[in-house]
Curated annotation (Swiss-Prot):
Organism of origin: Bos taurus (Bovine)
Signal peptide boundaries: none
Record-given protein name: Tripartite motif-containing protein 54
Region: Mediates microtubule-binding and homooligomerization, residue numbers: 168-211
Underlying gene: TRIM54
Coiled coil: 185-258
A cellular component annotation (GO) from this entry: cytoplasm
Length: 366
């Protein structure tokens, strides 16, 4: 069935156009949305310029970069539902554009520019029966047709229905489809908003965990530095004690050597005395001194291996291996780890005291 196209478009009647226009009015400027149109997290729409004006009014201390650009950050309330809108660093330019509303505005303006009276005069005319209007719908072939085609034409054996009935039915179906599409777009926009919030949460949680990780390793480094200092001090004390002992022995041996050398020198000079009487006057005393000096017992020398310091060797291989096994613990938050570390610290502090107590009790029993 061929026919001449001349039917009214979906938005052709004035009542539908008026209803649609009401849905396209901005709640701020009370005029039709001007591009770009932004959608808020609460799913209401605003002209971006109007959103900028609302933001400026709600944040008087924030200055615009220019007449049309708002500073990043800040917040304001939706004029329709009073829901608080939090802006990111892009300001109102970070809000999503509602391309669906912008497209509907374009369609509305195109339809509004067409004369309604000329559209009302157009009709579908049957090409096989030129004087017959298309007034019925063939349900079997799913095409509009005329009454003559049903009576003795190509659709005489088909099931038909009044054209207005099918028109209302399919218009209702299309309207429902549009509503579902719009609702689906709203849901998609809501999901996008949620996922953007998830991205922000991921970034924030990652930043916090990085900070905690740095703190943990800085704490480990501090413990290692503290322990290294303690061990170095112990090594230095042992070194000083041994050096003092050995140097004391050196001084003692040196004093004995000096006294012995002087006595030897005196004895040699006495032996060179040619007069026997003078020699004998000094000989007895020198003989006694030499005998006494030879019997002096000096302090013992350091025992073999006294100079060794290998008892201060530290084995860190097992600690290094343990450090290499440090890994993340899924499901454990930073706060829980802090509590665990605090509990372990308290138990560690109590341990030595308990050991000392046990030691005293054991000593008492023996």
């Amino acid at each position: 069935m061929n026919f001449t196209v001349g039917f009214k478009p979906l938005l052709g009647d004035a009542h539908s156009m008026d209803n649609l226009e009401k849905q396209l009015i901005c709640p701020i400027c009370l005029e039709m949305f001007s591009k770009p149109v932004v959608i808020l997290p609460c799913q209401h729409n605003l002209c971006r310029k109007c959103a900028n004006d609302v933001f400026q009014a709600s944040n008087p201390l924030w200055q615009s970069r220019s007449s049309t650009t708002v500073s990043s950050g800040g917040r304001f309330r939706c004029p329709s539902c009073r829901h608080e809108v939090v802006l990111d660093r892009h300001g109102v330019y970070g809000l999503q554009r509602n391309l669906l509303v912008e497209n509907i505005i374009d369609i509305y303006k195109q339809e509004s520019s067409r004369p309604l009276h000329s559209k009302a005069e157009q009709h579908l005319m049957c090409e096989e029966h030129e004087d017959e209007k298309i007034n019925i719908y063939c349900l079997s072939c799913e095409v509009p047709t005329c009454s003559l085609c049903k009576v003795f034409g190509a659709h005489k054996d088909c099931e038909v229905a009044p054209l207005p009935t099918i028109y209302k039915r399919q218009k209702s179906e299309l309207s429902d489809g549009i509503a579902m599409l719009v609702a689906g777009n709203d849901r998609v926009q809501a999901v996008i908003t949620q996922m953007e919030e998830v991205c922000q949460t991921i970034e924030e949680n990652s930043r916090r965990q990085k900070q905690l990780l740095n703190q943990r390793f800085e704490g480990l480094c501090a413990v290692l530095e503290e322990r290294k200092g303690e061990l170095l001090q112990a090594l230095a004390r042992e070194q000083e004690e041994k050096l003092q002992r050995v140097r004391g022995l050196i001084r003692q041996y040196g004093d004995h050597l000096e006294a012995s050398s002087k006595l030897v020198e005196s004895a040699i000079q006495s032996m060179e005395e040619p007069q026997m009487a003078l020699y004998l006057q000094q000989a007895k005393e020198l003989i006694n001194k030499v005998g006494t000096m030879s019997k002096v017992e000096l302090a013992g020398r350091p025992e073999p291996g006294y100079e060794r310091m290998d008892q201060f060797t530290v084995s860190v291989e097992h600690v290094a291996e343990m450090l290499r096994t440090i890994d993340f613990q899924p499901g454990t938050s930073g706060e829980e780890e802090d509590e665990e570390v605090a509990v372990e610290g308290e138990e560690g502090n109590a341990g030595p005291e308990e050991e000392r107590t046990d030691g005293r009790e054991s000593t008492g029993q023996h």
